[in-house]
Amino acid sequence: MAEIDTQVLELETGPDPVCSIIFLHGLGADCHDFESLPNMLDLPVGIPIRFVLPDAPMRPITINNGMVMRGWYDIGFDIDRGLCPDGLEDSARMMRTLLDREEQRGVAAARLLLGGF
């Protein structure tokens, strides 16, 4: 199993989760931004769910004058910057690793949700 080189906060609503929600925070935030997500959702009682909340890597963000902050990819000013901003491929690999890890932990692919803000 590939390693994840960032903090990942995991919350479970019960033992032996049958589904997992991987949720990504927004620019400059961290994994604790959605720590209250399980309590905010009107989840069915008795269905154990694992919430996987990873931190984005620290990187310079062009639109914020190059300030180093958590971001899944660089955001620039140029509308013609291309289809793959710096960092996007690395973040996609990280998401694939997290999805693979959940499958290896016994959660079926059909019961994995990847989302974010």
Residue ranges and their predicted role:
Residues 116:
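The Walker A (P-loop) glycine that initiates the GxxxxGKT/S ATP-binding motif of P-loop NTPases
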Residues 2-113:
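Serine-hydrolase catalytic machinery in alpha/beta-hydrolase-like enzymes
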